[in-house]
UniProtKB/Swiss-Prot annotation:
Domain of life: Bacteria
Catalytic reactions of this protein: tRNA(Glu) + L-glutamate + ATP = L-glutamyl-tRNA(Glu) + AMP + diphosphate
UniProt protein name: Glutamate--tRNA ligase
Pfam families in the cross-refs: Anticodon_2, tRNA-synt_1c
Keyword Nucleotide-binding: yes
'KMSKS' region, short sequence motif: residues: 251-255
General function of this protein: Catalyzes the attachment of glutamate to tRNA(Glu) in a two-step reaction: glutamate is first activated by ATP to form Glu-AMP and then transferred to the acceptor end of tRNA(Glu).
Name of the coding gene: gltX
E.C. number: 6.1.1.17
GO biological process, one term: glutamyl-tRNA aminoacylation
Length: 493
């Protein structure tokens, strides 16, 4: 009997996302319920954004939640390497195989040519897609350009008529027309694969039998299925999980909800409660009880109990459930966990240098730096009263800074200050006009340690969370303001 093997393959391009943890949990439970193996693979082919720091955060976040893997970059295994950036020769081999079989082809189009192609198609009211012009090149022309070292990508051929039947474990057979599919790039000019080729090759070579992934990938499933057919490989069983949603039913995003697992750890949530809550995202226990452990979920796991309606990720409900877990702890364990959370040595060492020179007794630390250990803060609304700026301008400055911070890839003090300065300069203000607002929103106080130091230590999700809280305290942002300010954001360097 074939051993069930599932996997999670996150990209290390930022803080570990709750959506990644959600999909990891369901893959883990499915594998363990069937006596199988759960694998961790790292999709780090985006060399500009991928970092080893983010990779380690993924490891730490999943382990904090109690999800372990039997094979992966940090534990090894018989199917390594488990980082896609270390498997380049493997992808090159299989891409070339597709070319030789006539299922893929080199494309020499420049970015300018592709932009022009899309513009012409849009002008005609057509869906922008690659028009296949490289297929018209003769073999001799292709070889000449390859020999000359001309930059190129490898694209896959796709049918132009008919439908692809996608067998989904949740929805049954889903029909998707082939004319919706583009001639997907498989290998980029830098010699690294795109998601589609790497996914299929890795899943096959690693013996993955079942793939549970987010439903946002369902529309592109025909490309994956076609690649399996081109290679002549058996495809794994596919399951497209419903996406997590904000309370307003929009797709879960950091603009409306904190999305980092690290944020919830820092906020003092219990990992058991986090797993429990994610387990209730579109799934339920046979007896419908709300509180259950990871092992109880594994023991009772059945994909037929997954609901296709978009599950709502609601922090208030998560907080309620976390309270149930906290109150059920023996008091000794409650005290022990509180100590571990509040007096984390690594976190304390980040804070201490910014506090030590500002106090004369230890008792002065809490009033000065207590905000480092809180989830949110409750600043007095009077702290946002400004001699120079109107209430609307105050909210505009804070909202624009929040948006700029959302685009920050590297969370460092100098880059944080760069975002603040960019907004201030564009609005023709001075730094001293904005910094008191940041102090109030982030620390809840008029003065404290350097606010940019504090933001760096608190991290991106907690910083953004407090800015959103402050904006809500000031009445929020109207739809009209949101639209106008987003246009303004586009012109800020």
């Amino acid at each position: 009997m074939t051993t069930v093997r599932t996997r999670i393959a996150p990209s290390p391009t930022g803080d570990p996302h709750v959506g990644t943890a959600y999909i990891a949990l369901f893959n883990y439970c499915f594998a363990k319920q069937h006596g199988g193996e759960f694998i961790l693979r790292i999709e780090d082919t985006d060399q500009l954004r991928s970092t080893r720091e983010s990779e380690q955060q993924i490891f730490d976040a999943l382990r904090w939640m109690g999800i372990e893997w039997s094979e992966g970059p940090d534990v090894g295994g018989p199917h390594g390497p488990y980082r896609q950036s270390e498997r380049g020769d493997i992808y090159q081999k299989y891409a070339q195989q597709l070319v030789e079989l006539g299922h893929a082809f080199p494309c020499f189009c420049t970015a300018e040519e592709l932009d022009e192609m899309r513009a012409e198609q849009q002008a005609k009211g057509e869906t922008p897609r690659y028009d296949g012009r490289a297929l018209l090149l003769s073999k001799e022309e292709v070889q000449r350009r390859l020999d000359a070292g001309e930059p190129h990508v490898i694209r896959m051929k796709v049918p132009t008529e008919g439908v692809c039947v996608v067998p989904d474990m949740l929805r049954g057979e889903v029909e998707i027309p082939w004319d919706r599919m583009d001639m997907q790039v498989l290998m980029k000019t830098d010699g690294l694969p795109t998601y589609f080729l790497a996914n299929v090759v890795d899943d096959h070579l690693m013996g993955i039998t079942h793939v549970l992934r987010g439903e946002e990938w369902l529309p592109s499933a025909p490309k994956l299925i076609l690649l399996y057919e081109y290679f002549g490989w058996d495809k794994p069983q596919l399951c497209y999980m419903p996406l997590l949603r904000n309370p307003d039913k929009s797709k879960l995003s950091k603009r409306k909800n904190p999305t980092s697992v690290t944020f919830y750890e820092r906020m003092g949530f219990m990992p058991e409660a986090m797993l429990n809550y994610l387990g209730r995202m579109g799934w339920s226990m046979p007896d419908e009880r709300e509180k259950f452990s990871l092992q109880e979920m594994v023991d009772n796991f059945d994909l037929s109990r997954v609901s296709l309606g978009g599950p709502i990720f609601d922090i208030e409900k998560l907080s309620w459930l976390n309270g149930q877990w906290l109150r059920d702890l023996p008091v000794e364990e409650f005290a022990s966990r509180l100590k571990t959370w509040a007096l984390n040595p690594d976190y304390m060492m980040k804070i201490a240098p910014h506090v030590q020179g500002r106090v004369e007794t230890f008792s002065q630390v809490a009033p000065l730096a207590g905000f480092f250990f809180a989830g949110g803060v409750t600043p007095d609304v009077k702290l946002f009263e400004h001699k120079k700026l109107s209430p609307e301008q105050v909210r505009q400055v804070m909202q624009l800074i929040l948006w700029k911070l959302e685009s920050l890839r590297q969370w460092e003090k100098d880059r944080i200050m760069g975002c603040i300065q960019a907004v201030v300069e564009h609005l023709k203000l001075k730094l001293r006009d904005a910094m008191p607002l940041m102090f109030a929103a982030i620390t809840g106080q008029a003065n404290s340690v350097s606010v940019t130091d504090a933001m760096e230590i608190l991290g991106p999700d907690l910083t953004r969370f407090r800015l959103r809280q402050a904006l809500d305290l000031l009445g929020g942002v109207s739809k009209k303001e949101n639209k106008e300010w987003e246009k303004l954001l586009g012109s800020i360097a």
